[in-house]
Amino acid sequence: MKSLRELELAGKRVLVRVDFNVPMDDKQRITDDIRIRMVLPTLRYVLEQGGRLIICSHMGRPKGKRVEEYSLAPIARHLAGLLGRDVGIAPDCIGAEVEAQVAALGVGEVLLLQNLRFYGEETENDAVFAGKLAGLADVYVNDAFAVSHRAHASVVGVAERVAEKCAGFLLQTEIDYFHKSMNDPIRPLVALVGGAKVSSKIGALENMLGKVDKMIIGGAMANTFLMSQGVDVGASKVEDDLLVTARNFLQAAGERGMKVYLPVDFVVADRFAADAVHKTVPADSVPEGWMALDVGPASSILFREALQGAGTIVWNGPMGAFEMDAFAGGTMSLCRDVAASQALSITGGGDSNAAVKKSGEADNISYMSTGGGAFLQLMEGKTLPGVDALEA
């Protein structure tokens, strides 16, 4: 996979795929622009090298129709402020009018194409649509790690049709950090896995067998593992169809010498609500009709001890329903412990990153990945279609 610095960009039409799928309020104001800021080094480099910059992205799920609330016009205005230069907004992402705008684009000028997902052909990796996008570019740059696990037209189809192609700085950084953490880690390597469902993480868990030295499992998915060991977790969320899978995983981990840490206590509630009655109980003493919504203080101490001396920490998924303050304690404690560690620490996934931001520890994490699904796919030991297309 070539890097951006290897290509000649002067005077070239440089099409950069980014992920500008940022949150907005009801007045079309951006509430968090981190995804835009993360690709600024790539965009600035293209401009510094005399490229003619064309940017493409999706936003939301307009399902192949033009939906004004998903227009990228507010992004163009915001980006102009960050770059300190005008950013044109195209009326569309393909077509004669767009082709004319690209042809007229001067060196150092910027054009943002309209939302790619206004066309259903984008998510279908349609050959004709990909060909029209590719026709706008002399050079293609993928700097959208967060969508590189999707075989979409702007991610795979365009890369297959443009001879000069490379990874942007953000995509390269993401791949490098993942390689450092999982393929060539400073040991011991500790994996923290949380979130709601075992079903969405089992591929990653099984791939990490034999690769990580310790694993901490929290969040609602821990209930299924505890239940597989005969622990009654009351009305807590359990995936009954995965009890055997969970039991087999724990057995395999033991056989390979990988220590797995499960919660030993919970903060339980009588219902899933911020104002629910709640209390702390041992993991095997969840009252009938109550549900576990966070790991308890004894679990936090256990997990802190498990992290001591770690060389590398990889974290995907929260320990509880941290969006409600009553059930945020376990996740916030873990954020502080990971931040205090001397280990190389990497978080992946929207919930994990949101938790770190809530804790105020973002500056003390080595790297916060921009990709949830892409990060998880790498954790599963799979390649990313977007990266494969750059290497073809």
Curated annotation (Swiss-Prot):
InterPro entries listed in its UniProt record: Phosphoglycerate_kinase, Phosphoglycerate_kinase_CS, Phosphoglycerate_kinase_N, Phosphoglycerate_kinase_sf
Reactions this protein catalyses: (2R)-3-phosphoglycerate + ATP = (2R)-3-phospho-glyceroyl phosphate + ADP
Subcellular location: Cytoplasm
Binding site for substrate: 19-21, 35, 58-61, 117, 150
EC number(s) given by UniProt: 2.7.2.3
SUPFAM superfamilies named among the record's database cross-references: Phosphoglycerate kinase
Keywords: ATP-binding, Cytoplasm, Glycolysis, Kinase, Nucleotide-binding, Transferase
Main location: cytoplasm
GO cellular component term, pick one: cytosol
Binding site for ATP: 201, 323, 349-352
Broad EC category: transferase
A GO molecular function held by the record: ATP binding
Keyword ATP-binding attached: yes
Pathway: Carbohydrate degradation; glycolysis; pyruvate from D-glyceraldehyde 3-phosphate: step 2/5
Single Gene Ontology BP annotation: gluconeogenesis
Residues making up the signal peptide according to the UniProt record: none
Subunit note: Monomer.
Family statement: Belongs to the phosphoglycerate kinase family.
PANTHER family: PHOSPHOGLYCERATE KINASE, PHOSPHOGLYCERATE KINASE 1, CHLOROPLASTIC-RELATED
Name of the molecule in the record: Phosphoglycerate kinase
